[in-house]
Amino acid sequence: MKKAVMLVSGGADSATVLAMAREIGYEIHSMSFNYGQRNNAELRKVKELIKEYNVKQHKIVDIDLRAFGGSALTDDNIDVPHYHDVNAVPEDVPVTYVPSRNTIFLSYALGYAEVIGAKDIFIGVHTSDSANYPDCRPEYIKSFEKMANLATSIGIQGQKITIHTPLIDMTKEQIIRTGLKLGVDYKNTISCYEPTEDDSSCGNCLACMIRLDAFKKNNIQDPIKYV
């Protein structure tokens, strides 16, 4: 069975990618990060997801991105924006963008993949993300993959490392639809940037707005708790 390293956040996208990778038949080694994020409820959801998908091994890596700040997710001095209409969400890079986060996460995943002998890395970036987040764009992923094959021992030996982005051409609506077909239980996920202490989602941050809109377009109620 082929090994794969998967970046897992505890959100709907991660759950869908987990289901897709399991369907293909990969032995999944997952990795999550405690990076000082405001929405660390996602780490509690991760524990439920890895049980559901029989993950071979899961690692939670501690990184202090609060040392840099620069994002509403890692800096208490920057407020998480809230919206009342999904169509009012701005198209520029939002303050919830964490500088170089995917580069940092993928670098850890790459190192882990080398150690366990995996040549496949999965990340759940998609169309809705790439419109707002520069490190979710297809050209970024291709560039990182090229770097990975130049910078690793297995890469220079001709054993190609592949960064898989199975959601890259999907909208959030399509992701939810795909997950539902695969039997994903979205009750065990959270997307909110600013959940309450009991893990209820706020319902009007960027992540919540996009998620709620996706479930609405699939004519199904989002099963998680909202304030």
From Swiss-Prot:
Instruction: Name its GO BP terms in alphabetical order.
Output: queuosine biosynthetic process
| Class of this enzyme | ligase
| Binding residues annotated for ATP, in chain numbering | V8, S9, G10, G11, A12, D13, S14, A15, T16, V17, L18
**Pathway as given in its UniProt record:** Purine metabolism; 7-cyano-7-deazaguanine biosynthesis
This entry's Enzyme Commission designation comes to 6.3.4.20
Residues annotated as binding Zn(2+): C192, C202, C205, C208
- The reply on keyword Nucleotide-binding is yes
Family per record: Belongs to the QueC family.
Q: What is this protein called?
A: 7-cyano-7-deazaguanine synthase
Which gene does this sequence derive from? queC
